[in-house]
UniProtKB/Swiss-Prot annotation:
Residues 467-478 have a biased composition (Low complexity). Its main location: membrane. This is Raftlin-2. Belongs to the raftlin family. Expressed in B-cells, heart, brain, spleen, large intestine and lung. Expressed in dendritic cells and macrophages. Disruption phenotype: Double RFTN1 and RFTN2 mutant mice show no visible phenotype under pathogen-free conditions but show greatly reduced interferon beta production in splenic dendritic cells under poly(I:C) or lipopolysaccharide stimulation. It comes from Mus musculus.
Amino acid sequence: MGCGLRKLEDPDESSPGKIFSTLKRPQVETKTEFAYEYALLDFTLQASTNPDVIKINSVLDIVAKVEDYYLKGYVVGAIHPVIQPVGQRKHLPASHLYRAVLSRLKLSPKHSAAGGQRRARLVMEECPLTCEAQANDAAKELMDKINAAAKRGMKFVGLVSQCYLPSMHCNGASHDGVAESGLHVRQDSQDNCKGWNEGALGGHLSESGVEEEPQHESGQHQTERNSSPSYANPKRGEAPDGKLYMVFNAFEEDAASWAYQEGVLSMKVTRKGAVISALDANWLELTTFYYKQGFSLIDSFVCWETPKGDQLPKSLEGFFIYEEEGSGVPGSNRRGNDAIVVEQWTVIEGCEIKTDYGPLLHTLAEFGWLLTSVLPTPILRHDSEGNLATKQVVFLQRPVTWNSAAQTPERKGSRLLKGEDRNKVSSRSLGLDTNASQAAGGRAPLEEGSLSPSRECWTKEERPAQSDSFSGFSSSDSVLRELDDGQFDQEEGVTQVTCM
């Protein structure tokens, strides 16, 4: 065992996931008085042979589908598409898959009384918004809408978009969900989705992304019903080709008003043609300032597509949406939050999710870690079995405990970085380009403005998606057990990489 960087001989050898945290691994696995239970629900706008994947005609249908869970004390913490439907990716069957993450408190015996828990219901509101190049205008418009709803007692959950569907799906179902023939459609769905994964995207995807995705629809199928916008990139000033919804938890009784604000989100991007093939972002540098102030990271907003006629940018500017003072998170009254950020490969077999962040999430739930946001990306690849895989970024938080607070002193580097300060900080590639992945395999010591000394990055290099779960991301007694405590010795101001 050593800390030499492994050369990625093949794209399939890239890491199944990386974990970044403001804590060392032993602190992450320290139990608190609170724990969570999670329920993960998958939805599809298409027919599916898997009974565990819930068929919906619109993302608005999710509201009714989760009602029974709300009666059991669960609330939705995040709703997100499985892949980021950008450009031709909107034609992929997987672009019609959505995930809802629900959680409920698992109280200790001394907190067994549930009287403090308020009954909530899920609410979705359409949010007309133009996807202009400048994120500042979008941020102000969105934040005004979110804060206006918060004053009515609505707790913000996130944003979810739905692209317009073609009149015929890959499974042969019509736009309104009526199938030509039930048995035929189910078989057609499975065959066509398999064709997309194994054939249509071919070798391009195993490298870095979809260079050119063939159009399976005929001319008449490429035209949307009811004169809906086409799949083409929007022109400047036009709305994106879909709808954007704001998701809230609304409470029956009067609730304290929540307040929300935006924070910087900046990502460097690598492209092959117009396709985004890799991302670089310093997640903890961007968010730690807010976590230390007791804010909760709720969601993010990024305009992934470039208006026609514009030069393709080398970076994407968006914003995170934070809830002030961690409102609604048990025990976080004006206390800072510790954070975990997971870069996770999610594998899709056919039209169904095969491997994802679920096992890790259930393990961390026992230690009081709350999932607050999932950022899907447009980065795609094939695993060794020919299945589609996409990169997702998962954000979890937990109120700072006395021990962790004592070992994470405030440093001048724990602040919001802007402009050239942010560019000084080294970053880790999320993409599939072999050279970028090699460079990202280890993080060099940070320059001035570095992270606090206890901030960690955990990584294990294994071939992804060859079994039901990734090695190191399994549903064993401890997902993190393979990480040796002794590997977390580090020097002042240096973020370490655990090399296996």
